[in-house]
């Protein structure tokens, strides 16, 4: 089995369905003998360019270990899901379990917001 990093972008109107989508994709991988090493929900972010007249979208990153058949099934699911605007699958050499640089940035932004809210409350 090989290791893969998958990033997919979801339509912002479908953001509330992201946890269900993640569970569906995780169950697809695990039911066929694969493993999910890391799941990161990066949240709603600004797009680099307009996609379908949208400026923002919901980003999700998943690191998995699976076979070719499972990967083909996932790619098929991404292609025919209208809520998924774009997806990228990259083969990696080893399983990534540490937080990605993007997730660290998301955590920093959340910490700044929390600090600003606590200052306003005080």
UniProtKB/Swiss-Prot annotation:
GO CC annotation, single: cytosolic small ribosomal subunit
Coiled coil (UniProt feature): none
SUPFAM superfamilies for this protein: Ribosomal protein S6
What is any one GO biological process for this UniProt entry?
translation
What InterPro entries does this protein map onto?
A: Ribosomal_bS6, Ribosomal_bS6_sf, Ribosomal_S6_plastid/chlpt, Transl_elong_EF1B/ribsomal_bS6
In Gene Ontology terms, what is one molecular function of this protein? structural constituent of ribosome
Could you tell me the superkingdom of the organism this chain comes from?
Answer: Bacteria
* The entry's keywords: Ribonucleoprotein, Ribosomal protein, RNA-binding, rRNA-binding
Record keyword rRNA-binding present: yes
Region described as Disordered: spans on this chain: 95-122
HAMAP family per record: Ribosomal_bS6
The Swiss-Prot or TrEMBL record describes its family as follows: Belongs to the bacterial ribosomal protein bS6 family.
Q: What does this protein do?
A: Binds together with bS18 to 16S ribosomal RNA.
* Name used for this protein in its record: Small ribosomal subunit protein bS6
């Amino acid at each position: 089995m090989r290791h893969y990093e998958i990033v997919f972008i979801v339509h912002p109107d479908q953001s509330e369905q992201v946890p269900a989508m993640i569970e569906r994709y995780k169950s697809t991988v695990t039911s066929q003998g694969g493993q999910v090493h890391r799941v990161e929900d990066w949240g709603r972010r600004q797009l680099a360019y307009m996609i379908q007249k949208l400026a923002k979208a919901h980003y999700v990153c998943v690191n998995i270990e699976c076979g070719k058949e499972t990967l083909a099934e996932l790619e098929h699911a991404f292609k025919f899901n209208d809520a998924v605007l774009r997806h990228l699958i990259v083969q990696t050499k080893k399983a990534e379990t540490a937080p990605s640089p993007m997730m660290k940035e998301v955590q920093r932004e959340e910490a700044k917001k929390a600090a600003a809210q606590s200052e306003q409350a005080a």
